[in-house]
Regions:
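Leu/Val/Ala/Ile-rich N-terminal alpha-helices, chiefly Sec-type signal peptides and the beginnings
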Residues: 2-72
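Short charge-dense sequence patches
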Residues: 4-16, 40-41, 75-83, 98-108, ...
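Amphipathic, well-ordered alpha-helical segments in soluble domains
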Residues: 10, 31-34, 38, 64, ...
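Non-transmembrane, amphipathic alpha-helical segments
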Residues: 20-31, 43-46, 50-53, 76-86, ...
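Long, charged all-alpha helical bundle/coiled-coil segments in cytosolic proteins
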Residues: 57-113
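Long, charge-patterned amphipathic alpha-helical coiled-coil/hairpin "stalk" segments used as oligomerization
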Residues: 95-140, 144-149
Length: 149
């Protein structure tokens, strides 16, 4: 058996790390899609007034986010990738919209486990989701609720 040269050992080590990173990236992409899907379904349930279902979907998204964040701790380049942060933003948006519609306190970034930038983007997008709620309340002639939202 031939012993690899120092350069060969270094190259093998790099290849193993890159392969691990690629696998982690693939898992993060898939999990990010699932989180985004759950968050979108939570927002839809919120619009339909199905707050218990919205909460259930949101909880599942948040649980997946916790697991994903733990898995990505050793891979900051993947954690900070746009597709991971976008998934976190979508989950935060669903949580913010649900909180406002359900008359609950507005959750903070730390409550949701998201970075500040993702939270601020979620806050802006939740405002556009609330536009639909306002229009629905206006159609129902519920001016007080529309004004509140």
């Amino acid at each position: 058996m031939v012993t690899p040269s120092p350069a060969g050992r270094i190259a093998e080590s790099i290849v193993r790390r890159v392969e691990g990173l690629a696998g982690t990236r693939d898992r993060a992409l898939g999990e990010g899609r699932q989180i985004t899907r759950l968050a979108a379904n939570s927002v839809r349930a919120t619009h339909r007034g199905e707050l218990a279902e919205a909460e259930r979907l949101l909880t599942e998204a948040q649980n997946r986010m916790i697991v994903l964040k733990a898995e990505l701790r050793p891979y900051p380049s993947v954690y900070w990738a746009g597709y991971v942060q976008d998934a976190m933003k979508e989950a935060a948006e669903a949580a913010i919209a649900l909180a406002i519609v359900a008359d609950r306190p507005l959750p903070e970034p730390a409550d949701l486990g998201v970075e500040d930038a993702a939270y601020l983007n979620a806050l802006a997008e939740a405002a556009s989701e609330l536009r639909r709620q306002v229009l629905d309340r206006l159609r129902e002639n519920d001016l007080a609720r529309a004004e509140y939202l």
